[in-house]
From Swiss-Prot:
Function: Involved in valine catabolism.
Keyword Hydrolase: yes
Similarity annotation: Belongs to the enoyl-CoA hydratase/isomerase family.
EC numbers on record: 3.1.2.4
Name recorded for this polypeptide: Probable 3-hydroxyisobutyryl-CoA hydrolase 3
Keyword Nucleus in record: no
Organism: Arabidopsis thaliana
Keywords on record: Branched-chain amino acid catabolism, Hydrolase, Peroxisome
Pathway: Amino-acid degradation; L-valine degradation
């Protein structure tokens, strides 16, 4: 089966090592991979002989996101429900990971974007390295940070989550550790030794795993130009109520001090889909007050509207401009933030009405919900 070659499984004593294996596609998650991961995680949770699950990627990426082009192709052909099924399974997997009763260690030694964050950040342990590149670039594609991102981004220090989710800014391993998205930082040259020691774990008690990881972890310095050094500016600007106010605040910062970071941030926001920016901001803000299950259920409503194309076709246009034609010149609709009214935003958060057999995402209550460990290291 293709799914078995795309997710490799190693059994080492009481540890299971899963490797995402589509290196040419930067381990982008297709439907078969998501189904396979969901099957394996559920089986391991029921198997008393399994104490720890390690997840990593083959090649230079952990996982660069979901396999979006086939989903968009189905949208164009009017088969939006196939995309809805893809996201239903993906969000269910995210929920299982967020509520997993056994420790999961994700080794983020490379590119981590979009769906790659969904299969790692919800787990208890996230290992960054000097090769880590993290981003949530959905607003530049006409989508929104999903896979439970409204839950984990909203729990970052201050308004750093809004900054990361709205701009698609890239973070390195040191920044990931500093803001709490990573729990540990381990040099890539030490990963083989770390994995060997983790495979000696004979208990599902997270403290045993934590002790091993703590022995390997380092605390790298942030680069001088790191966005994390600008938390005061980020909080001042991204705490504003609306997207228009956020951009105005950033523009005021540039009048006081000409700064490449502010200009780059404004440019990224102005190139993104106005509808995506507005629904993303609201989603992250609502996530501050919601549990992970509630966030995923809400995001499923939102993504079904995107799949159906009844409220916006920006995902189709963004995919064309960024992934297919690569002219990087999407024609968003509406083109201006001020034309995306609050009443239009509201519709993304409502049920998909007038559709037979459509249902909200139903996530069964689980007793294992562990608080997401977002602990800033600075």
């Amino acid at each position: 089966m293709a799914s078995q070659s795309q997710v490799l499984v190693e059994e080492k004593s009481s540890v299971r090592i899963l490797t995402l294996n589509r290196p040419k596609q930067l381990n982008a998650l297709c439907f078969n991979m998501i189904s396979r991961l969901l099957q394996l995680f559920r089986a391991y949770e029921e198997d008393p002989s399994v104490k720890l699950v390690i997840l990593k990627g083959q090649g230079r990426a952990f996982c660069a996101g979901g396999d979006v082009p086939p989903v968009v192709q189905n949208m164009v052909q009017g088969k939006w429900r196939l995309g809805a099924d893809f996201f239903r399974d993906q969000y269910t997997l995210n929920y299982v990971m967020a509520t997993y009763s056994k420790p999961q260690v994700s080794i983020l030694n490379g590119i981590v974007m979009g769906a790659g964050a969904g299969v790692s950040i919800h787990g208890r342990f996230r290992i960054a390295t000097e090769n880590t590149v993290f981003a949530m670039p959905e607003t530049s594609l006409g989508l929104f940070p999903d896979v439970g991102a409204s839950y984990f981004l909203s729990r970052l220090p201050g308004f750093f989550g809004e900054y990361v989710g709205l701009t698609g800014a890239r973070l390195d391993g040191a920044e990931l550790l500093a803001c709490g998205l990573a729990t540990h930082f381990v040099p890539s040259t030490r990963l083989t030794a770390l994995e060997t020691d983790l495979c000696k774990v004979g208990s599902s008690d997270p403290s045993f795993v934590s002790t091993i990881l703590d022995a390997y972890t380092q605390h790298p310095h942030l680069k001088q130009k790191s966005a994390y050094h600008r938390l005061d500016v980020i909080d001042r600007c991204f705490s504003k109520r609306t997207m228009e106010e956020i951009i105005s605040a950033l523009e005021r910062e540039t009048t006081q001090e000409l700064d490449d970071w502010s200009l780059t941030t404004i440019r990224a926001l102005k190139k993104s889909s106005p509808s995506s920016l507005k629904i993303s901001l609201r989603s992250i803000r609502e996530g501050r007050l919601q549990g992970v299950g509630h966030c995923l259920t809400r995001e499923y409503r939102m993504v079904c509207h995107v799949m159906k194309g009844d409220l916006s076709k920006d995902l189709v246009e963004g995919c064309r401009a960024i992934l297919i034609d690569k002219d990087r010149n999407p024609k968003w609709e509406p083109r201006r933030l001020e034309d995306m009214k609050d009443s239009m935003v509201d519709q993304f958060f409502e049920r998909v009405e007038e559709e037979e057999r459509w249902e909200d995402l139903k996530l069964s209550p689980r007793n294992n919900l562990h608080a997401l460990r977002i602990a800033a290291k600075l």
